[in-house]
Amino acid sequence: MDRRRWVPSTPVVTLLLLFMLFAPAPRLPSRNGESSEKSIKAEKRAFSEIKNATFLNIPERVEHSLTFPTEIWETRDGLFEEPVGKGDSHLNHTSVMTGNWNILPYPSFGKVSPNVTWHTTLRNIVMSQSGRFSANLYEYVDGNSDGISFVLNLENNNDTSVYHMTFHGDRVKPINVFLGSTDVTPNFGGVDVIPWLLKDSPYKDAPPLDGTEYFPLLQNRSLERIETRLQDAQTVGWSPLVFEEEEVTCSAFVFLHNKNTGLDKETLKAIENEFYHPQGVSTQKMPEVFVSGLVYSPDCNVAFTFSNTKGPRNFVLENHLVRFSSLYIFIVLSQIFVLLRQMRINSPSHVQRLSFLTIAMQAGLDAYIAIFFLSTNAVIEKGYLPFVSVAFLSLVPSVMFTMRYLALILRVQNSNMPPPAPRPVTNNSSNNNTNQSNASNENSPNAPSAANDNTETTTVNPPQEDDQPMTQHERDQRDWSAVCLRFYFIILVVCIASLYSAFWPVIYRFYFISALIFTSYSFWIPQIIQNVKQGTSRSFTWTYILGASVLRLYLPLAIFIDSELILGFPPKYFFALGLVLWMLFQVLVLLVQDTLGPRFFLPKKFFLSSPVYDYHPVIQQDDLEAFMRDANVCPICMQPIELVSTGSTLNPASMMVRRNYMLTPCHHLYHRQCLLQWMETRSICPVCRCHLPAV
């Protein structure tokens, strides 16, 4: 095959073009001298306003964002008045949590400001009255007031829409309160308003907290953020106080209140030290983070609350994933072991019966798992060693062993296929034959001289390289190149789709993952079809069938049962049970094919053109007179063979006895296991050397 003539496949080029065209690109603000000067002046003015302000003397830009309805103030005060419980709070609240939210109705609910566009997805979610959410809380420890980030993923009640909101702010340690806001805009104070979010409610005489006590601390934090924005304005020439996004959506504040752990600080510190610096010391289990919250958008006039939402600390979740991946290392090693056991049987008669698609699906599954663990390793720092180990070990069978086995299967099955049809005779070849006949006539003494006059002169073209038939080796190379191209193209498409599914609503993400899992774990279906087409039932060894079926269930069952904090959907026990039953069904079909024949479930009229030789005919003791003496002795092991007793041949006992012996077309009787073991390496009769049909 001339590889210089190879051109990229059309689907590959199309996919790359679509990816480049539709890949999200960040909107970069324009930079010029006027915009840079305007941005710097705006940030300096904001810095001066916050620095010279007091708790009671609120800047106009900030006060505009603090116009809250009565219901918001009352809900905030009720949130801060919740009991915090015994013990101390977590030293760091970085965690992952899931829970349910409910809207907070009030008279002006949903009245959007004139200059704000209500995001369609957010509006649909809020109008559903309630739903689920997942959130990541990040805390950056620094003195008495720690910086926080709160990433909130809102979902409606049927999980078909999702809206992402990111808040930044501060944690006030003495009162177990988190205060945050979305980004600053020209019409929204954002994080600059945080020092006044603890102001007294105008509708309540006795406030739950004294905001003046924590105002200096929060004011300094706001000044630090403004200084950072000022440096960015001097570098980039852009400030959120001057320029805003093309479409202004709902800006919002978040109020969070966390509960104590029931443990003292020394115990909490010991638990964290044991995680980051393991010494083998027995410690208590780290308590979960409990948070209640209120989210309010003054631009869109919407608010919702959530109560007692809990989730594990990040290092607890990371430790759980590390244990999972460490155990999965032994699972992958076991898969490699059973695969190598299977690859020992590489005789052409055995390889001919294997399904190419079954091995290809398992190789693709291993490659996808390796990419998945490598991607997860980029997020979880502590899991580097186990995650990379799993990725490497998953690539070992996919790249080294399975692909080599695929090449062997392809070569053997191609060699048993009929040769390609001959090329049709072209004009050049017919002209060549005419010229040859004319030349022979010229050499003949009896040929008429007029023949030379009437014969037209034709040009004899030399044989072209493309006209030469391809050898078997060239056909194998061509087919293998096509297989590799399709294999890696499918892996690329699935990986890109999986990447984009991370931003889909939970229900769509779950359906995508479920479809991917059930499709990938149908790898025995091609082998069942191969058995039916070839009329054979002895394919993979049962060690490999059972080992691959059981070991490969570990990862998908973990996804269905224990991935709420990672993939976002609650445990799906029904789907986990369905996957186990689906895998069990495939194995049972292979077992019954091995016992009752590969076409046991199909009528014989479908295969009249390709009948299958029956190695298990009914042979009774009375029929032995037709054979030679000692015909019921196996020639391989020299042990007697149990035959069907005289009587009915339809009872289950007689049918099972028939499966214990095999009669060849040359009328030689063997034990089933003896002949099958012989046929793993040879397809001839041990006695007379006649060819034996596949089992």
From Swiss-Prot:
Keywords per UniProt: Endoplasmic reticulum, Golgi apparatus, Membrane, Metal-binding, Signal, Transferase, Transmembrane, Transmembrane helix, Ubl conjugation pathway, Zinc, Zinc-finger
Pathway: Protein modification; protein ubiquitination
Top-level taxon: Eukaryota
EC number(s) from the headed UniProt entry: 2.3.2.27
InterPro entries in UniProt: DUF2921, HRD1_E3_ubiq-ligases, Znf_RING, Znf_RING/FYVE/PHD, Znf_RING_H2
Classification via SUPFAM superfamilies: RING/U-box
Catalytic reaction annotation: S-ubiquitinyl-[E2 ubiquitin-conjugating enzyme]-L-cysteine + [acceptor protein]-L-lysine = [E2 ubiquitin-conjugating enzyme]-L-cysteine + N(6)-ubiquitinyl-[acceptor protein]-L-lysine
Ranges of compositional bias, category Low complexity: 427-454
ZnF region ranges: RING-type: 634-689
GO MF entries: ubiquitin protein ligase activity; zinc ion binding
Description of the deletion phenotype: Lack of proteolytic cleavage of sterol regulatory element-binding protein sre1. Simultaneous knockout of rbd2, results in defective proteolytic cleavage of sre1 but restores its precursor levels.
Annotated function: Catalytic component of the DSC E3 ubiquitin ligase complex which is required for the sre1 transcriptional activator proteolytic cleavage to release the soluble transcription factor from the membrane in low oxygen or sterol conditions. The complex also plays an important role in the multivesicular body (MVB) pathway and functions in a post-endoplasmic reticulum pathway for protein degradation.
Designated name of the protein: DSC E3 ubiquitin ligase complex subunit 1
Source lineage: Eukaryota, Fungi, Dikarya, Ascomycota, Taphrinomycotina
